[in-house]
Amino acid sequence: MSSFDIFSPTASVSGKFFLEASAGTGKTFTIEQVVLRSLLEGSIEQTKNILVVTFTNAATNELKLRIQASLKQALSLFSQALSHPGTPLPPYISSSETKVKQLYMKIRNSLATLDEMNIFTIHGFCRFTLEQHFPWIQPIQPSSIFSEPQTIQQHILDYLRKNLWDTVLSPKQYAFLSYHHRATTQQTRHLIERLLQDYTSTPNLALSPLSITLQKLKAWVSRYQHLAPLSLEEMQAFSLRFKQSDLSIERELPAFVQQFETNPYSLDMLFFPGMVQKFQEENRNKKKLSAPASPLDPFFQDWIQLAHPFCQKEPIFHTLLKSVQQHLKTHCAQSYSHDESIATLESLLAHNDTVVSQLRKQFQLVLIDEFQDTDKRQWQIFSKLFASPDYSGSLFLIGDPKQSIYEWRNADLPTYLQAKHSFPKEAQLILDTNYRSTPELMQALNHLFSLPTPFLETPQNILYHPLHSKGSAEISYSEFSPIHFFSSEDIQEETLWISKTASYLRSAYSIPFGNMAVLVQDYPQALKLITHSTIPMAYCKEKRIFDRTESPYLLILLLEALLYPENQQKIQAILMSRLFQLSSTEIHQHLKTFSSLFFTLNRHLYHYSLLATFYKLMGENVLSQTIGETLLQTPLGDIIFQELEALCLYLDKTTENPHHKLLHLINILITGKYDEELSFSSQSNDENMIKITTVHSSKGLEYDVVFCSCLNKAKEKTPSVHMREMYVACTRAKKFLFIPFSPIEKRSLSTKKLSALANYANVTKHHSVPHLVETLTSSSPELFSSSFQPPESSLTPDRERLPQQTYFSLPHLPSRTIHSFSSTVENLHFSEPIQELSPSLLFPGGSLTGTLIHKLLESLAGNFAACFEEIFNKAQTLLKNTPLEGYESIIAEKICTVFSTTLPFSSGSFALRNVHPHNIRAEETFLLQEEGELWQGIVDLFFEHKDRFFIIDWKTSFLGDETSCYSPDQLHLYIQRQGLDRQERLYRKAAKRFLHQFNSLLQVEMAFVFIRGLDDKGNGFLQPGR
């Protein structure tokens, strides 16, 4: 393969090329420069004649920004060349004044029309082509009632409700599958949810038809029918020849014996999961190998071949999924998933030369990025369009087989290699200069990946091509070589080593924690590292809103109902969604009520934000509970709630016009283009935080220091996948690469699960990982080093020892006093000891009484409709063995009065028992800054009633014997004397600050309620400032 230099005058960007771009070789930079050079040299006329296809939506956005930046830089350069003729230009450009002016104008025009450039994912390109050239074939369009996911979900529900699965699964298989998808934990999902999420996937593991399985079963029964009736005792004795398994077979053995005797031709004969697991050949007890041969050996060996796939969860699910897909194709005419859109376009292009000719004419430059992740059908489309001799434009296929780690997304290496060898040798190019890693680290990586020969064993072997380094970083490798192996026997020791080494590198090399990464296989491994780490670490993973649930479609339905409340079809659509989950009967019975609700919400949307309207809707009661509660009780309901919040907030920021919000959201779904703001990411930009991420998520990223914990964890993968993931992990590093290994790990040919490092040792003919490490470090100590002890003890005396672990800490801020009313207000009555009973005061006073009654009121929050007996029982429980024991009856009576008495707030009078329990919050803490001072407060009661918000502060103060002692005038004097008017002002300010996050017009009222003196004459209640 020839080296490709985009700036070389002898290099060409006109023609068809296959470009291999190893990690760190500036692939994206090359793409943007190919676009720029093609524009400058005139091989393309306008930006709309450019087609770039890449892997993800995020990559399309990044590419467009990078190309835009490249064009701006070129525009600045040519502008400078016009005013300063001696300005150096790219070597492939003529420096004549006329030429420079023409190119300046072309770059300026290209920038102005950059939005016309076609940058797609493969699925986006297929949808675009189908819409433009085959308009009669469209994906499902959201109807006036259902969005696409809802339409699909309805058909899946019908499929399951009508038991259509019984043509592909046995009843026991379906029951087994349903059980494993019950939504009892965060790790399990309803079967419908998974079918809805995966209905576009390819069911590669689907089982043979039941008719074929039944034929094989009958042949097996005929072969072994002479063994009937089976002896349970012999079966139990036979089972002792095998090791203990996770699933018990105590109940299965008798059932198996009976099934074989009474109805062996039933498919139930194959469904004994515990026996399938138990009687696997690898589970044989080696101590029992000397036992005499048993006729049950061939009996069960043949049975296992039939029963094993029949009892596996994923093959059963894929079988069901395949049947559901066929059902959807029949009942959802012209419905195309991502994968189906590829297959459809491939089929249409095969028989439509006119469209092929139009596409070839439209696109003069085509760049296919991440080509190693392309599958056979995608290549059929691109080869038909642009690899053909009839295509006169330029084509670049850009990829790296060493980084093909997405086999689960149908990435197909044989297709990559087939495409590569369809190009002549002179058109097979390579980027062979690494701009990421230091020269020393690059030399070590070259050595490491040149040892396996070939690098990947495939039908056409893949070789590793060493790279030159132009990494700009300079580093002194005194303590560690560029690649350092460290020994760890468990995750705790590994984490401690990483923590200490990272701290040392930060101190000795001024490398921030934020420029370091730990690569893991999965989240459980990340969690263990975070748990044991002594320095700050964060797990970084990104999920896009549009990849997870149907929340965007739900929001479209909601916006349509909010904008058009007079349209009953749109109202019915949202009422049937998971937000409401109402049946058609319930909708018909309460349609007028719901219409009224959406007319009210329509006004709310125009006066306030979409987010505030969403929150108001979530708090509305429908039948027996709020809409928010209904949503949160559904599978993934909490995630959908968060996504709807994020979408509402994003649309509020984008435009104030409610109609534009709807159009903007629809446009996002159609084009697939959206801001990164609509991604849920835990990516941390904190320089004091080490990032933990998976190998797959790290692709395309780079860090100064990389700890490859992923290479030391055993996983059941093919040697090829292990090697590719190891390559991706190691090539993320710019300066240092650290690899943990187990000192006791040995090669085992019979072991299915290996770590990537153990696989590498196998491939390179080392008998163990320690042997591999010893070989590398002894043969090339300038490239590889190792530690077999913790860092401190492994250092020689003449070397600087690793510093003692320094724990991270936040900078010290000057201390500030936090004020509270319990600490600043002297209440003489509360400081008194327990008082004797007075004739009219039926229970003691003092601070302890206040605390106990507050606790009792807190326990009753949300239950203000409680009767006297219920309050009395609660009081007996809470006041037992306290100074108030014996006063439960009078205290319960007082509290009952508080709940039932009409409270005369300025906005309207009502009793607490009339407040909806879901609108109540008790003992809410806040921190507020007021005039340079920090105030902490605890709101006794915060609630909403009839769209108004209220605060109540309970008072148990003793002001006198009669309720007249608690008249408004007396309470005003008491409030002023105690400074409680300031408390009222601060509490209301804190509450308004909270509410204004959702609606800046919301107001709060506050009142003090004196438990001892409240009556129906207005005593015991005070609303300051009224």
Curated annotation (Swiss-Prot):
Region DNA-binding and helicase activity, interacts with RecC: start-end pairs? 1-766
Its cellular-component GO annotations read: cytosol; exodeoxyribonuclease V complex
Q: Where does ATP bind?
A: 21-28
* Cofactor notes: Binds 1 Mg(2+) ion per subunit.
From what organism does this protein derive?
Chlamydia trachomatis serovar D (strain ATCC VR-885 / DSM 19411 / UW-3/Cx)
Q: Where is this region: Nuclease activity, interacts with RecD and RecA?
A: 815-1026
Give the record's keywords alphabetically.
Answer: ATP-binding, DNA damage, DNA repair, DNA-binding, Exonuclease, Helicase, Hydrolase, Isomerase, Magnesium, Metal-binding, Nuclease, Nucleotide-binding
User: What does the record give as the active site?
Assistant: 953 (for nuclease activity)
Self-association and partners: Heterotrimer of RecB, RecC and RecD. All subunits contribute to DNA-binding. Interacts with RecA.
UniProt comment concerning the protein's domains = The N-terminal DNA-binding domain is a ssDNA-dependent ATPase and has ATP-dependent 3'-5' helicase function. This domain interacts with RecC.
Enzyme Commission designation: 3.1.11.5, 5.6.2.4
Q: Which residues form the UvrD-like helicase ATP-binding domain?
A: 1-438
This molecule's function is given as: A helicase/nuclease that prepares dsDNA breaks (DSB) for recombinational DNA repair. Binds to DSBs and unwinds DNA via a highly rapid and processive ATP-dependent bidirectional helicase activity. Unwinds dsDNA until it encounters a Chi (crossover hotspot instigator) sequence from the 3' direction. Cuts ssDNA a few nucleotides 3' to the Chi site. The properties and activities of the enzyme are changed at Chi. The Chi-altered holoenzyme produces a long 3'-ssDNA overhang and facilitates RecA-binding to the ssDNA for homologous DNA recombination and repair.
- Other information: In the RecBCD complex, RecB has a slow 3'-5' helicase, an exonuclease activity and loads RecA onto ssDNA, RecD has a fast 5'-3' helicase activity, while RecC stimulates the ATPase and processivity of the RecB helicase and contributes to recognition of the Chi site.
Q: Any one Gene Ontology biological process term?
A: double-strand break repair via homologous recombination
Family, as annotated: Belongs to the helicase family. UvrD subfamily.
- Single Gene Ontology MF annotation: ATP binding
Cross-referenced PANTHER family, in alphabetical order?
Answer: RECBCD ENZYME SUBUNIT RECB (PTHR11070:SF23), UVRD / RECB / PCRA DNA HELICASE FAMILY MEMBER (PTHR11070)
Q: What is this protein called?
A: RecBCD enzyme subunit RecB
